[in-house]
Amino acid sequence: MFMTNPFDALSALISTDVMQMYIIVMAVLVAGGTILDMLHKKSAQYFFLDSAKNAKNAKRTVSTGEKAGLAVATIASEVITSSEFCSTKRRISHLFTMYGFILFVAASGLLIFGCDTFSTETLAQVWHTGATMLCIGGYWFWFFIRVDVNSEGVKWYQLRRADIFILSLLTTATFALIWSNLQSKGGVVGDMGSTTLFFGLFLIANTTLFSTVMWSKFAHMFFKPAAAFQKRVAHADGSNLNLPGDFDLSSPEVQARFPDIPEYMGKNPEDMGAGIRREAPNHY
C-alpha cells in the first residue's frame, strides 16, 4: 500500500485534468477564505495598528539587517520547531500534525500534477507517511491534549465550530489511508462498495477542510509567524508590546517611581514565586 500511488487507479474513473482542477479550486478556496477571514476579523488591520503603536513607543530603531536576523530566528524557532508551546507533549503533537500535513498536501500535488524529480514510489511513501503522521499527532491532540478535554472536563465528543479544522484534517487523513488500503487490495472506486464509500468520505472531508477556512482555525497558521516576528521586533526595539517592563521591586529607583510598592509590600518585597505557572493546569 505504501508504495502505491492511490491516484493512479482513480484516474481510470476520474481524469487527471479533473483532479488537477480540483486541487486548483481548493487552493483558490484557501486563499479566498484567508482573505475573507482577514477582512472579517480585521487581523491585518490589527497587526498594522499594533505595529504603528509599537513604533511610537520604541526606544531604539531596529535595522533592516537585524530584522532579517529576527525573521530567520522566527522561522527557525516558532515556525520550524514550534517553540511557542510550553508543553513538550503539545509541541510534539503539533510537529507531527504540521509536518504530516505538509508532506501529505505536497505529495498529493506532486502525484496528481506529476514530478520528474522523485519517483512515484517515493512520493507514494511520502503521501502515506504524511497521512500517518497527521493521524498520530491529530488523534493524540484530540483525545489527550486538548485543553478543554484535558483541563476543563469537556467530553471529547462534544463539538463546536472551532473543531472544524482539526476534525476535517483528521478525517481527511484517516479516510485517505482507509481508501488507499482498500484500493491496494483490489477495491475499485466505481464498484459502489466500501472503496467508493471511503473515497467519498475522503473527498467530503478534504473539501470541508479547504472550503471552511473562514469558519475554522485554518487561517491561523498564516498569522502565527507574523505575530511571532512582530513580538521579537517589539522586544528588540524596546516597545515590549506596550507591556510594563520587568522591574526589580527592591530597587530604590523603582520604588521612587512607584511609591506604592514600599508602602504595601515593604522595601524588600518577597519573591511571589511562579504564580499561575506553579503547576500544569490538569484539573478543573
Give residue spans per PLM region.
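Membrane-embedded alpha-helical bundles of multi-pass integral membrane proteins
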Residues: M1-P252, R278, H283-Y284
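Intrinsically disordered, polar/acidic, low-complexity terminal segments
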Residues: S251-G266
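Membrane-proximal soluble helical/coiled-coil segments
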Residues: E263-Y284
